[in-house]
Amino acid sequence: MLMILWFFNQIARCRVNFTGGDGYKPIILYHVIH
């Protein structure tokens, strides 16, 4: 479980960088995938 959260955290950081600091999109994307 911790590895999954860590992996999501890495993706979220990259996503935030691409979206210019929007931290909501990675969370939404995470919920859409799951």
UniProtKB/Swiss-Prot annotation:
Completely overlaps RTK1. This is Putative uncharacterized protein YDL025W-A. It comes from Saccharomyces cerevisiae (strain ATCC 204508 / S288c) (Baker's yeast).
